[in-house]
Design a protein with these regions (language model features):
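Short, Gly/Pro- and small/polar-rich lid/capping loops
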Residues: 2-13
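Generic recognition of long tandem-repeat/solenoid scaffolds
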Residues: 17-21, 36, 69-76
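Short solvent-exposed loop/turn micro-motifs enriched in small/polar/acidic residues
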Residues: 12, 19-20, 57, 64-66, ...
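A residue-level signal for beta-strand positions that form part of recognition/binding surfaces
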Residues: 18, 23, 33, 141-142
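A low-complexity, Ser/Thr/Gly/Pro-enriched, surface-exposed linker/loop concept
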Residues: 2-4, 29-68
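Long, contiguous hydrophobic alpha-helical segments, chiefly transmembrane helices and signal peptides
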Residues: 19, 44, 135-136
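Catalytic and substrate-binding clefts that recognize carbohydrates or anionic sugar/phosphate headgroups
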Residues: 5, 64-146
């Protein structure tokens, strides 16, 4: 836990919401928000970032089924399939339940998807369109922050 005079940061997720192997760690933050990490040395980042200061959210109901080197993870909002090894489009995908269509939307590791864009810091001196960085919403139901 990190503290200062203004706020408390809890950048480490709940242990009961974490699925971890020697080189991977998946932390469920909500039923539809997951942090996925892979490191060859098995040393994972536990400090707060500029974007995320708190990862200690409420407990999440989920189910895990081990599959060879990997697993399948289920919540009421997503289905994650991880085959093991480094993250690639062939080893990691996520199906968002109720995403783009009645069958959901599948995201494969490395895909950018159909991101809807983020927010502008200011609209001062903007006349018309302004460029936006990627945001946290997409038309497919899956987006990523790296």
């Amino acid at each position: 836990m990190f503290e200062n005079n203004l706020w408390t940061m809890e950048p480490v997720g709940r242990p009961e919401n974490t699925i971890q192997g020697d080189k991977y760690r998946f932390t469920l933050l909500t039923p539809c928000l997951i942090r996925m990490e892979y490191r060859e040395d098995g040393k994972f980042e536990d400090r707060p970032t500029q974007v995320v200061w708190n990862r200690k959210f409420d407990p999440v109901d989920f189910r895990v089924e081990k599959k060879d080197e990997g697993f399948e993870l289920f919540t009421d909002r997503m289905h994650v399939t991880y085959a093991g090894g480094p993250f690639t489009k062939n080893s990691l995908n996520l199906n968002a339940v109720g995403g783009q269509n009645a069958y959901g939307a599948v995201w494969y590791y490395g895909e950018k998807g159909d991101n809807l864009g983020g927010t502008a810091r200011t609209l001062d001196e903007v006349d018309g369109e302004c460029p936006l960085q990627e945001g946290i919403m997409s038309r497919s139901g899956c987006s990523q922050i790296d």
